[in-house]
Swiss-Prot record:
GO terms for molecular function: electron transfer activity; protein-disulfide reductase activity. It is a multi-pass membrane protein. It comes from Cupriavidus necator (strain ATCC 17699 / DSM 428 / KCTC 22496 / NCIMB 10442 / H16 / Stanier 337) (Ralstonia eutropha). NCBIfam families: PRK02110.1 (NF002552). The gene is dsbB. The keyword Transport applies. This is Disulfide bond formation protein B. It is found in: Cell inner membrane. One of its GO terms (cellular component) is plasma membrane. InterPro entries: DiS_bond_form_DsbB/BdbC (IPR003752), Disulphide_bond_form_DsbB (IPR022920), DsbB (IPR050183), DsbB-like_sf (IPR023380). Required for disulfide bond formation in some periplasmic proteins. Acts by oxidizing the DsbA protein. GO terms for biological process: protein folding. Residues 1-8, 59-63, 156-161 are cytoplasmic. Disulfide bonds join 35-38, 94-122.
Length: 161
């Protein structure tokens, strides 16, 4: 069971980090400039990945790391829902996003600007990827990963009863 649990969390981390890799590919190879909401969704995927790695190696505190991974996912889902709603209603945005200054002032934007610096507009029309916008794909994957962590936590709790 322990080997299965470790593989379970490692797979979640791999998918999370892989999706950040897809975002970087779209940024550097396809020219999709990340907006502040995109960067915040990257933080959510990275949070899920890091907490899943910690859950894989720390059996005694696994539920804690799993819960924190779920919180990262829930925060990312909230951001992605808002982002998708902005794309569906572009007139709701004023064009200048005050969130950009805040995101770009974070230490991560200064340490790794290639990954965490936001210079795109949240309502910029970008070509769809496999028929959906990037924020829609982000929402789908954040939901899947968060649900996967939640199901694992529920199963774990049932096994201890």
């Amino acid at each position: 069971m322990q080997a299965n649990s470790r593989a379970y969390f490692l797979l979640i981390a791999l998918v999370s980090f892989g999706l950040v890799g897809v975002a970087l590919y779209l940024q550097f190879e396809k020219g999709y400039q990340p907006c502040p909401l995109c960067v915040m969704q990257r933080f959510a995927f990275i949070g899920i990945g890091i907490f899943s790695l910690l859950a894989a190696v720390a059996q005694n505190t696994r539920s804690l790391w799993q819960g924190l991974g779920m919180l990262s996912g829930i925060a990312g889902i909230a951001v992605a829902v808002y982002h998708v709603s902005l794309l569906l209603n572009p007139k709701a945005s004023c064009g200048i996003d005050p969130l950009e200054n805040w995101v770009n002032a974070l230490p991560t934007a200064k340490a790794l600007p290639q990954v965490f610096y936001a210079d795109g507009l949240c309502t910029a029309p970008l070509p769809p990827v496999l028929g959906l916008s990037v924020p829609a794909w982000s929402l789908i994957w954040l939901f899947i990963l968060t649900l996967t962590l939640a199901v694992g936590l529920i199963r774990r709790e049932k096994n201890f009863r």
